[in-house]
Amino acid sequence: LSRISKLQSINKEVGLSDHSNGILSAIISFSMGVTLIEKHFTIDNKLPGRDNKFAILPKDFSQLVESANEYNLMQKNNSKGFIKQESEVRKIYTGRWSK
């Protein structure tokens, strides 16, 4: 992650080859402008193979895709209205403190 901005000064399009455990670094990289993420995928971290130890499971992959989609939606929302997720949270807090 620390090299992304340096690489972007050379080439606008930068990807992340993520060999860390979990999906946090991949999620953080969205906000840094990364356009491609490479992440190892497995159905069982106990299977043989050196990459299986840090590969993500299907539930983690789903969460990563959902996070990427939400991030893209938030970035592209130029309207004055709220996206679905913002509206749901707004209802909770507006109701709580508006009384």
PLM-predicted stretches and their roles:
Residues 1-99:
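Catalytic cores and adjacent flexible loops of soluble metabolic enzymes
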